Amino acid sequence: TAPGELLPYNWEAYSASSTPFKIGSFDCTTGKTVYWGREDVKDNSDFTTRCQASSSIPIAMPMVQLDGTAYLDGAIGETGGFAVDAARADGYERFLVVMTRPRGYRKGPVKAPAAIYQKIFKKYPAVVEAILRRPERYNATLDELEQLQAEGKAYLYYPETMPVSNGERNAVRIQAAYEEGMQQARRDLPAIKEFLAG
């Protein structure tokens, strides 16, 4: 696929699979995280819309409208972007969590004044509150995950390096980061399999 073009999704393979999944997004009106599963997806376009809703970073990307409701990135929700609540609701007690920040990372306070968010999201006070509370929620969930890891109930897969940010657009740098990640995954796969087998 050329830069600027959409990467086609293999809808046929998706439709043939019965593997369960969850897509989490933040409901801008209620301030709650909503999780969609296979049963909620009608077609390829609907799937794409839900994925966009799940990853629409506040301010950087527009809200996504779905069935008359505005959604943003699920990372601003109650668990700070970790879908542990969804996994628990589905009955899971052990968790493999793929991290995007280095070991020891904690989110610092929101830097921009609250008034900026209040102006941008004046119709959505729940979004303002969620953005302002994200560091607290993220850090609290990460503390919980680290405790679960100490108890043998979670495997936190940290990147050895993260040479790109979520706003990276340079294809060469993205590809290089991907290759680094694949090398680490191959090295760490035996330990991950051992955890999953336990």
Please give the residue ranges for each predicted region.
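Patatin-like phospholipase
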Residues: T1-G198
